[in-house]
């Protein structure tokens, strides 16, 4: 607006002047005079600028009063005008001089007259009045030409030439022969710039100044002028303006290698192993390789001279540096390609070096010669394809060693003939496939010994079977099978030697097998000529051959799997990885053909006896009533079990077993429905025998989707084929699903249950069921019985149907129960077949009729019944036949100090004591069995699980909830509830017949029933419930205490899985609870307060005391402070002569229930007066005027010192010097005045010890002085006090020792509340899990709130009172010597952390600036340091102080 107003005012003034002078002006006869208002502002400005440049000497200023804006040379718009040189220098100078003279001579001309003079001087011919606009344009062009010419001339004059001489530089390495001085060098340069002014003569100084002024014209306008030139003027500016020097294009540029590429190469070289030589690299085209490093690659090795072509490829010298080694190096360098960038090197030198390396390697024999027309293999080769044969050879050697060791161990222990034959088959078949001549020879020697041992074992088997009443038909079959196996074994030995000699030159056949699965049979035909694939192998031979169960070699593979099939297994594993399954029929043909090839014998086809082996076997099994079809076993299974575990006995021949694991792509591993399981009758297989029985039972039904010859199907009478068909049954590439199998395979990370399926009686789950007990000795004994029954099934037929029931009549009266060794007390009852356990197992059965009396009579027993019941259960759990010496019992008893026992809730239960038929029952045996440690049991479990998993590759079979147990927690069912009993420890002197009084019973409340389908995790720990009853009597809490150590063990009742509670910890808990109750503490919330708080009294002083004669007695005072418990006195201090006391003493008094009042006493001691000044009046006679006149006297008063008769101070003080006392009642009215605030108080000092003086002038003794009657109490002064009461609300509060420190703490608290800051921070942690976000944070005292960076909604609120410390880069210190960890310091360099009291850490970082981040760190650290002053009393005290200040 100001600019527009200025322009309008100027235009108005010009118009007014033009109107005033229009009548007086006369037109000139020689031309037309143009009015000034028609020229225009733009043209007028150019005219003024022109006149200013050409009239610099006359100091012409177009507008002297205006505030002109000077333009810089860079901003001069004249530089933008075209530069034309249409005039000569002489003519231009003449015109300028003429124009200057005209204008300078007529200083009083108007603007129009000046314009006319300018037109006349230039000889301009103006057009008529009708073309005024053309005149203006012509005039403008003239001015532009003049300005351009003057600027060009000035620029040309500024350029000068500078010549100078420079002395040459002496060489760095001086030559003694050369004594020449360095030559002088002439240098000529063009110099221009403002410094030339200083080089000019003095006479030209004025012209140069005028010239410099002309280059900076003054604008006549008052409006500020802004140049519209671009800011980035260097972008498009010419080279002259930017003063940049460029390099000519003809000079070649040298491409320098980047630092990154150099570092990469150096890193690769440093990562090379010390045994390898550094690789040398040759770049064919240096220029292209340096410009595109990413395109470098590693081609095949070539020994011809083609590396000099323009291929821009990096060649590798043929040294020991291989591709797979380089891949390892590349993986250690992040963000680096496999092809590194390499420094440009000399091509010739590198070629020489490469040739030298090649020659050296060839001389050493490292590099083999390759034909010129062929290329070496690529650098990056596939190790899996090149090393398959090596892997198989190593693996076969290892397996051979393990097999030989196993054979030695089994021969030494005289194992059965089946296990020996199985090992020999594995050994010989392995030797046939081994690639080492020495190993085959060794195996041949071993097999010769094996053959001899086989014969011995065969004879022993004949004796064994004949002595055990085996069926004669089965006996003949076993002998025939043994003979067949011996023949096959001997033939395999020769076959292995021949096959090795025949296939020594064809060791690459196995690699050919890996290329194509369809070429397996063709490969067999190439390696073994003369064998026809259509040959029919007799069934008798086929059944004796080792069966191939193709399992993943890296997971679980049975030890008894024939090693002759290792190549087929490897192929199958590779096919499984590629998700392509081979045909089952084809694999069976391969196995059959390969077995015949190994034997190198020609078998004549014989008509096989249809189902001869199976029928015989089934007839024998059907004759045994105690053995069901679910427990059938085969001779093959017997061999597998004997080789897989050392503790499993020899099994009778049973039907063939299918593979154990399921490699089914359709199988659901995570199915937990257990639809085919009985929840109450689940089995937990503990050994191979139980697993095989389970499989035989669950695989009876054959799925119609399975082929008759599939290796995954069950080979029964209906599905087994007598002849192996070479035609596959189906073209389906995946393995069929076994729909009849009801168990699922689980990984090894679960806990395997050790209860045997043979000893679980599912129909009678009872508390007295001994088969649910699980201890070491009983487990071993039961396993021995199982082995005997399975080895000799003919003797266990009658025993399988026998169930022993022993009932003891319950007695109401408490008395010991002893176990007698009399067999007459035992009653044997035969039960029906439907109540017997499968596989001929035995169980002690408790009749259901006794369960009715169980609840009614159990309460009448003592608490120690739980201990005796545990002994009874352990008695069932142990086998009484165990022959253990007394020395072993004593040794075990001394070692095992902690005895496991189980507790049962106090309910009346009828029970029975089965004792068995064995007459030799010793109490020491029972004691030894009870002393078994839990650790020993766990060790046995872990050893057996490890043995089973290692030998057989089996996992854990999941069971139902009723059979899951964790640790040593045993569970049983009672009244429809699943109960787990935690074992506690008890002393060694327990007698199973001793019961305690029923008065000390600890009752346990009943729990709600748990669903039978509930499956608890074995890793879930549920804390035991302490079953204690508390009786409230007279407002006090009491607890019934346990009388003995055995009764102090707590009872833990849980629904599924519980944790073990030891008696020691339970006793400690009971003792701690008892002490707490006796002390009257009921917990943290109801914990009594230590005191009411702290009372601060600041004694300021007293008013003037009503005490005379202070100066004469020289008194001293002291203050006595009595709170009812302690008495405190101050030092004796001189009393002021004015009678005022300035105390300035502070006392802190903890207020509790015993303190009701405070007594403050002022005590004074003084110096007793011995002499005193007495005023005496004397009469002095005056002379008589008359002789008989009256005698006249004058009086005169005098002070006479005499001994003191009595002192007034003697009647004012008590014996101890007490003079004044005030009593402060500590009541609520006082606390209300001074609670959490400082208040002025005043208390009267009363003298209660003043006595009445007696009127007699006689001197009173000191003893009689205190017997005088006392005066009534009177006020002698006032005590001024400042008081403050800090009330306690928590025992954790800490009060300062003085009121002054309390005030300073409040000040610190206030300063903490005043700390504020806000800004953006990056947060990691807290509510952000594994991520980092930018938020806007506000710090207000102890509250740090984070807001969303856009919406500004609060997202997180951090209580700084919970922060323990703030960690920055300077706070990371470790070690005793406070040595800083440099790594942590680097990581914490750009962030800081808040560490909370629970260990949580939140990291913050500020990206804006380091100063801002340091400010955040310092403020947060100050807040955390001031947290120590953050107590409840501080906040209240601070609030009251603010109110008082207002």
Swiss-Prot record:
Keywords, ordered alphabetically: Cell cycle, Cell division
Bias (Acidic residues) ranges: 86-98
Protein localization: Bud neck
Main location group: other
Chain ranges of the PH domain: 1314-1425
Chain intervals for the UniProt region annotation (Disordered): 69-103, 358-385, 425-446, 495-525, 823-844, 1025-1044
Biased composition (Polar residues): 425-434, 495-524
Recorded superkingdom: Eukaryota
MF term (GO), any: GTP binding
Family membership noted in the UniProt record: Belongs to the BUD4 family.
Protein's UniProt name: Bud site selection protein 4
Species in which this protein is naturally found: Candida glabrata (strain ATCC 2001 / BCRC 20586 / JCM 3761 / NBRC 0622 / NRRL Y-65 / CBS 138) (Yeast)
Gene name per UniProt: BUD4
């Amino acid at each position: 607006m100001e600019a527009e107003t200025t322009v309008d005012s100027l235009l108005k003034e010009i118009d007014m002047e033009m109107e005033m002078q229009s009548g007086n002006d006369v037109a000139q006869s020689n031309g037309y005079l143009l009015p000034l208002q028609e020229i225009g502002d733009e043209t007028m400005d150019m005219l003024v600028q022109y006149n200013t440049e050409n009239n610099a000497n006359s100091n012409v200023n177009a507008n002297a009063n205006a505030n002109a804006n000077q333009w810089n040379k860079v901003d001069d718009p004249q530089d933008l005008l075209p530069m034309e040189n249409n005039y000569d220098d002489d003519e231009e100078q003449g015109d300028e001089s003429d124009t200057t003279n005209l204008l300078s001579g007529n200083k009083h001309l108007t603007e129009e007259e000046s314009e006319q003079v300018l037109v006349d001087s230039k000889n301009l011919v103006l057009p008529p009045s009708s073309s005024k606009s053309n005149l203006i344009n012509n005039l403008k062009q003239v001015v532009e030409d003049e300005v351009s010419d003057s600027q060009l001339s000035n620029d040309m004059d500024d350029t000068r030439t500078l010549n100078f001489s420079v002395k040459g530089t002496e060489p760095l390495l001086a030559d003694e022969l050369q004594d020449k001085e360095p030559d002088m060098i002439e240098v000529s340069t063009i110099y221009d710039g403002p410094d030339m002014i200083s080089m000019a003569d003095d006479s030209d100084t004025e012209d140069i100044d005028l010239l410099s002024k002309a280059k900076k014209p003054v604008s006549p306008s008052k409006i500020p002028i802004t140049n519209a030139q671009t800011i980035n003027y260097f972008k498009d500016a010419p080279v002259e303006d930017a003063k940049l020097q460029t390099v000519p294009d003809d000079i070649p540029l040298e491409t320098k290698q980047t630092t990154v590429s150099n570092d990469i190469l150096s890193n690769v070289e440093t990562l090379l192993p010390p045994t390898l030589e550094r690789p040398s690299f040759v770049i064919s085209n240096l220029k292209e390789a340096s410009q595109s490093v990413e395109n470098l690659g590693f081609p095949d090795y070539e020994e011809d001279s083609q590396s000099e072509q323009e291929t821009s490829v990096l060649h590798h010298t043929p040294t020991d540096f291989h591709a797979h080694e380089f891949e390892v190096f590349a993986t250690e360098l992040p963000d680096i390609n496999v092809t590194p960038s390499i420094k440009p090197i000399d091509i010739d030198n590198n070629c020489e070096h490469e040739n030298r390396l090649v020659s050296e390697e060839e001389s050493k024999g490292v590099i083999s010669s390759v034909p010129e027309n062929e290329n070496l293999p690529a650098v990056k080769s596939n190790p899996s394809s090149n090393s398959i044969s090596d892997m198989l050879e190593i693996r076969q050697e290892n397996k051979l060693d393990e097999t030989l060791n196993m054979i030695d161990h089994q021969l030494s222990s005289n194992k059965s003939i089946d296990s020996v034959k199985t090992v020999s088959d594995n050994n010989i078949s392995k030797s046939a496939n081994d690639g080492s001549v020495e190993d085959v020879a060794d195996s041949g020697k071993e097999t010769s010994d094996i053959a001899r041992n086989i014969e011995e074992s065969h004879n022993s088997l004949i004796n064994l079977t004949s002595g055990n009443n085996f069926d004669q038909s089965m006996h003949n079959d076993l002998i025939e099978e043994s003979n067949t196996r011996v023949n096959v074994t001997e033939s395999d030995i020769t076959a292995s030697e021949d096959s090795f000699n025949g296939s020594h030159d064809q060791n690459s056949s196995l690699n050919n097998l890996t290329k194509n699965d369809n070429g397996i049979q063709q490969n067999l035909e190439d390696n073994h000529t003369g064998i026809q694939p259509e040959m029919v192998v007799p069934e008798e031979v086929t059944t004796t051959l080792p069966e191939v169960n193709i399992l993943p070699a890296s997971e679980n593979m049975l030890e008894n799997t024939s090693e002759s099939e290792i190549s087929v297994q490897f192929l199958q594993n590779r096919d499984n990885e590629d998700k392509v399954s081979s045909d089952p029929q084809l694999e069976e043909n391969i196995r059959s053909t390969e077995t015949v090839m190994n034997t190198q014998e020609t078998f004549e086809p014989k008509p096989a006896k249809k189902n001869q082996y199976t029928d015989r076997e089934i007839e024998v099994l059907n004759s045994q009533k105690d053995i069901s079809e679910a427990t059938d076993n085969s001779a093959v299974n017997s061999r597998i079990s004997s080789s897989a575990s050392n503790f499993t006995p020899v099994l009778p021949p049973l039907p063939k077993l299918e593979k154990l694991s399921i490699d089914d792509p359709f199988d659901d591993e995570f199915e937990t429905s257990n639809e085919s399981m009985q929840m109450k009758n689940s089995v937990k297989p503990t050994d191979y025998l139980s697993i095989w029985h389970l499989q035989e039972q669950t695989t009876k039904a054959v799925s119609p989707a399975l082929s008759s010859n599939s290796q995954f199907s069950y080979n029964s009478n209906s599905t087994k084929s007598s002849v192996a068909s070479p035609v596959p049954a189906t073209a389906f590439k995946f393995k069929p699903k076994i729909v009849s199998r009801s168990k699922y395979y689980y990984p090894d990370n679960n806990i395997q249950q050790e209860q045997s399926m043979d000893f679980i009686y599912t129909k009678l789950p009872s508390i007295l069921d001994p088969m649910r007990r699980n201890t070491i000795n009983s487990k071993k004994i039961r396993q021995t019985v199982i082995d005997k029954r399975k080895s000799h099934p003919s003797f266990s037929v009658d025993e399988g149907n026998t169930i022993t029931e022993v009932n003891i009549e319950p007695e109401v009266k408490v008395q010991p129960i002893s176990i007698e060794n009399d067999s007459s007390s035992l009653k044997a009852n035969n039960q029906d077949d439907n109540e017997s356990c499968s596989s001929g197992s035995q169980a002690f059965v408790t009749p259901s009729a006794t369960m009715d009396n169980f609840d009614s009579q159990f309460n009448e027993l003592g608490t120690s019944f739980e201990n005796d019941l545990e002994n009874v259960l352990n008695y069932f759990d142990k086998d009484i036949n165990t022959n253990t010496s007394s020395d072993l019992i004593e040794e075990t008893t001394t070692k095992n100090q902690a005895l496991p026992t189980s507790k049962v809730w106090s309910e009346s239960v009828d029970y029975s004591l089965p004792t068995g038929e064995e007459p030799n029952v010793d109490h020491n045996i029972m004691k030894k069995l009870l002393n078994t440690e839990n650790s020993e049991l766990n060790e046995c479990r872990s050893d057996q699980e490890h043995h089973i998993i290692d030998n057989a590759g089996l996992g854990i079979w999941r069971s139902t909830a009723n059979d899951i147990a964790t640790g040593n927690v045993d569970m049983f069912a009672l009244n429809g509830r699943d109960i787990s009993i935690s074992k506690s420890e008890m002393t060694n002197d327990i007698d199973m017949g001793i019961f305690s009084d029923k008065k000390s019973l600890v009752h346990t409340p009943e729990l709600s029933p748990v669903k039978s389908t509930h499956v608890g995790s074995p890793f879930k720990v549920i804390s035991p419930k302490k079953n204690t009853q508390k009786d409230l009597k007279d407002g006090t809490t009491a607890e019934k205490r346990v009388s003995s150590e055995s009764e102090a063990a707590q009872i833990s009742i849980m629904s599924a899985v519980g944790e073990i509670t030891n008696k020691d910890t339970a006793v400690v808990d009971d003792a701690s609870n008892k002490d707490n109750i006796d002390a009257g503490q009921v917990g943290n919330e109801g914990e009594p307060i230590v005191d009411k708080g702290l009372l601060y009294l600041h004694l300021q002083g007293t008013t003037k005391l009503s005490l005379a004669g202070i100066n004469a007695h020289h008194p001293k005072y002291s203050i006595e402070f009595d709170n009812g418990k302690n008495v405190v006195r101050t030092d004796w201090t001189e009393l002021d002569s004015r009678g005022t006391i300035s105390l300035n003493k502070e006392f802190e008094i903890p207020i509790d229930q015993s303190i009701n009042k405070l007594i403050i006493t002022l005590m004074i001691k003084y110096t007793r007066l011995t002499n005193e000044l007495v005023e005496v009046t004397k009469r002095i006679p005056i002379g008589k005027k008359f002789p008989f006149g009256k005698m006249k006297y004058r009086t005169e008063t005098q002070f006479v010192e005499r001994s003191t008769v009595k002192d007034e101070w003697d009647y004012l003080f008590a014996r101890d010097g007490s003079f004044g006392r005030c009593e402060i009642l500590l009541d609520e009215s006082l606390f209300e005045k001074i609670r959490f605030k400082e208040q002025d108080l005043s208390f009267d000092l009363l003298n209660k010890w003043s006595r009445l003086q007696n009127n007699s002038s006689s001197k009173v003794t000191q003893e009689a002085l205190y017997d005088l009657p006392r005066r009534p109490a009177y006020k002698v002064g006032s005590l001024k006090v400042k008081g403050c009461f800090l009330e306690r609300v928590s025992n954790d509060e800490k009060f300062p020792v003085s009121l002054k420190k309390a005030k300073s703490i409040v000040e610190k608290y206030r300063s903490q509340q005043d700390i504020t800051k806000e800004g953006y921070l990056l947060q990691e942690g807290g509510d952000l899990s594994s991520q980092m976000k930018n938020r806007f944070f506000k710090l207000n005292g102890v509250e740090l709130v984070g807001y969303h960076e856009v919406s500004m909604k609060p997202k997180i609120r951090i209580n700084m009172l919970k922060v323990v410390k703030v960690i920055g880069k300077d706070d990371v210190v470790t070690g005793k010597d406070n040595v800083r960890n440099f790594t942590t310091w680097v990581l914490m360099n750009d962030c800081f952390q808040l560490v909370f009291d629970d260990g949580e850490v939140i990291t913050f970082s500020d990206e804006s600036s380091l100063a801002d981040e340091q400010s955040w760190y310092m403020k947060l650290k100050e807040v955390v340091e001031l947290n120590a002053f953050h107590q409840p009393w501080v906040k209240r005290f601070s609030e009251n102080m603010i109110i008082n200040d207002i």
